[in-house]
Amino acid sequence: MKKTITLLILILSYSLSAQTWGNREYWISYEYTPKADQISEFEKAVKEKTNKWNTNFETAIFTFEVVNGPNSGTYERWVTRKDRSFFDQDFSKEIEYWKKNVGKYIADQSGQQTWRIFKGASYGWDPENTTINKFYQQNRVVVKAGMTAQFLRAHERMAKLMKALNYTGNRAVFRIENGGNTREFAVVYGFDQHGGDGSGIWTNLPEGSSVRDAYNEMFGYEAWTTDWEASSKAIELWGNLAQKTRFRPELSTKLQ
């Protein structure tokens, strides 16, 4: 009887784990720095490769150029919204094409990095939101071991507040799942202009109220201070990377 109960627990645990993994959404990134004297050749080769291999929703890839900080001039290529089955596909021919036709123009590159998007802590990144902004700000931190829940709480509540107040901007929280430090998180938001309300408007924010006031109204007295202090204390390494990227549509899949 004891063995039967143990077996049932193991089966149930595996089933729940599989369901959890199955519901996760993955974004895959690659970084490339072209040779200084071959940037135009690199871009031409990337464009040709994209037009040949990445022409529909299933094979789509999007390119962003880092425009500030130590990685300026690096190009990020992102594959978005995938489940685990993506990693079972055979990309050998596509990889071989890349090595032969694009690789010769590359001075440095990263390996594949797999990111998990935390949907409950993100807003404006649902599949139906297909608009790609001109710029994206990435702020990366390393979170202390065992402190993920404390870090995410404020971000999850901010996402709920954004929805309730019909925020016109967007915000997403990612964590590296493979190919890097699995305690590294990236908080990302997109925008089209640097001045004015380029990052978004809190449409339904009551007149005379601040976002902090609205947060406390929704989640309780001094919730803003409590939650953000807890989130800050959960961070082991601040400023791991803060950079801005610019979308390069001509080097990306064109979706109708």
Regions found by a protein language model. Name each.
Residues 1-23:
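Bacterial Sec-dependent N-terminal signal peptides
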Residues 18-256:
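Short S/T/G/P-rich N-terminal loop/turn motif that feeds into the first structured element of a domain
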